[in-house]
């Protein structure tokens, strides 16, 4: 059951390694092939990624939320399957309702909630986050091992590495 206020791995919660492994490996228990797995951390049907991180970590400094956003993006782009982003995720999009609340179902909300704030894009935090996303996309494109198209190829090229740290996830990916 999805709980938008429950912290996940990106927010510092200790999560089941088998679940994390399955995500990185293209959900082999659910999808026959990795390209049948669509990887995302936010979509139009719920909070934006940044809003969810802020809800889960209400006292976290903005820079912590930005780092968590980038970690979530790394999960999306470094996992087997099809990456999917909500519009504006790469520029820390938020849908504020006012009084510290965020809109989780904004299809009837006005433009002031749904609009992408293009005037903020010159800010260094937005530029740095956008550059980070672009770097992840380029990295994924450059390494075929991150874009396997068959279950056997994933099994032959992606290997979880045990770190002994419950808050660390590590993989070795080989381009073949």
Regions inferred by a protein language model and the residue ranges of each:
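Short, well-ordered beta-strand micro-motif
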Residues: 117, 170-172
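Catalytic cores of secreted or luminal carbohydrate-active enzymes
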Residues: 117-151
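Residues that flank catalytic or metal-binding motifs in active/ligand-binding sites
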Residues: 36-37, 112, 132, 167
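Extended hydrophobic/aromatic segments used for targeting, binding, or gating
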Residues: 91-131
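Charged, low-complexity, helix-prone segments enriched in Lys/Glu/Asp/Gln
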Residues: 62-71, 113, 133, 137-140
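Conserved alpha/beta catalytic core and glycan-binding cleft of carbohydrate-active enzymes
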Residues: 1-92, 96-97, 107, 144, ...
